[in-house]
């Protein structure tokens, strides 16, 4: 269990990177590096550039995150 709660923010996928990593532009115009969460990887949910996603950011490192949801 983490000591601090994750910060959830909305963003748009800018570019796909190798190993299921993505560059995501957040609503506040910051660019973060994000990877796909385990359940999204397990169920083969595809993420393409331009998709709206929900990203969880750790309060310790705000430049990296985990994509937890892809909006339709």
Curated annotation (Swiss-Prot):
Occurrences of domain S1-like (ranges): 1-72
Transport recorded as keyword: no
Alphabetical keyword list: Cytoplasm, Initiation factor, Protein biosynthesis, RNA-binding, rRNA-binding
Cellular location(s): Cytoplasm
InterPro entries (UniProt xref): NA-bd_OB-fold, RNA-binding_domain_S1_IF1, S1_domain, TIF_IF1
Principal location class: cytoplasm
Top-level taxon in the UniProt lineage: Bacteria
UniProt-listed CDD domains: S1_IF1 (cd04451)
Molecular functions per Gene Ontology: ribosome binding; rRNA binding; translation initiation factor activity
GO cellular component terms given for this protein: cytosol
Signal peptide positions (record): none
Gene3D superfamilies reported in the protein's UniProt record: Nucleic acid-binding proteins
PANTHER family (UniProt xref): TRANSLATION INITIATION FACTOR IF-1, CHLOROPLASTIC
Reported function: One of the essential components for the initiation of protein synthesis. Stabilizes the binding of IF-2 and IF-3 on the 30S subunit to which N-formylmethionyl-tRNA(fMet) subsequently binds. Helps modulate mRNA selection, yielding the 30S pre-initiation complex (PIC). Upon addition of the 50S ribosomal subunit IF-1, IF-2 and IF-3 are released leaving the mature 70S translation initiation complex.
Assembly mode: Component of the 30S ribosomal translation pre-initiation complex which assembles on the 30S ribosome in the order IF-2 and IF-3, IF-1 and N-formylmethionyl-tRNA(fMet); mRNA recruitment can occur at any time during PIC assembly.
Protein name in the entry: Translation initiation factor IF-1
């Amino acid at each position: 269990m983490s000591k601090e709660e994750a910060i959830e923010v909305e963003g748009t996928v800018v570019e796909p990177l190798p190993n299921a990593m993505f560059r995501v532009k957040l609503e506040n115009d910051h660019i973060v590096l994000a990877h796909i969460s385990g359940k999204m990887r397990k169920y083969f949910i595809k993420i393409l550039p331009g998709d709206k996603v929900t990203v969880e950011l750790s309060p310790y490192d705000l430049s990296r995150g985990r994509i937890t949801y892809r909006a339709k």
